[in-house]
Amino acid sequence: MARANEIKRGMVVNYNDKLLLVKDIDVQSPSARGASTLYKMRFSDVRTGLKVEERFKGDDIIDTITLTRRTVTFSYIDGDEYVFMDDEDYAPYLFKKDQIEEELLFIPEGGMPGIQVLSWDGQIIALELPQTVDLEIIETAPGIKGASASSRNKPATMSTGLVIPVPEYLSAGEKIRIHIPERRYMGRAD
């Protein structure tokens, strides 16, 4: 059991007799005094795959589920299925493309370290990515000389197809670090 303000992205909750995977959380702070903060959560139903949206007050109690986490590595694509191998016992985990469509925007062609498969009671629930990823910019407007003092952004397309705003001084071919949960530019990659 946890309060709504303690729920994070990637957690699984039991709500209305449904297992729901938290995909996104919007926090809405009221302007009136005494009003409680609202948490608008978008879920994916684990059993049906349907999208569900619910609102909670910050002190609402929600039943959370403890998940088993296994570290995996992206292996190969088989039709519309993506195969990930367990790093310890090499067991394959299969995901349909529509199950992990959001996550695929952050996984580079050669894979990335830190990917985990979440399971509960032997059932595969989701794929969890690390907090950051380094990706290469493949398309953006040319860098503007002297734009380093500017705080303006421009859209940039990454090697995976992801489009995020980046500072004006960056150009195509540069590797940048992206914060996955917020989909934002963090800095140049090492």
From Swiss-Prot:
CC annotations in GO: cytoplasm
Any Pfam family: Elong-fact-P_C
CDD domains xref list: S1_EF-P_repeat_1
GO molecular function: translation elongation factor activity
Gene Ontology terms: biological process: peptide biosynthetic process
Matching PROSITE patterns: EFP
Highest taxon above the source species: Bacteria
InterPro entries: Elong-fact-P_C, NA-bd_OB-fold, Rib_uL2_dom2, Transl_elong_fac_P/YeiP, Transl_elong_KOW-like, Transl_elong_p-like_YeiP, Transl_elong_P/YeiP_cen, Transl_elong_P/YeiP_CS
Record-stated family: Belongs to the elongation factor P family.
PANTHER family: ELONGATION FACTOR P, TRANSLATION ELONGATION FACTOR KOW-LIKE DOMAIN-CONTAINING PROTEIN
Protein name: Elongation factor P-like protein
Species, as recorded: Pectobacterium atrosepticum (strain SCRI 1043 / ATCC BAA-672) (Erwinia carotovora subsp. atroseptica)
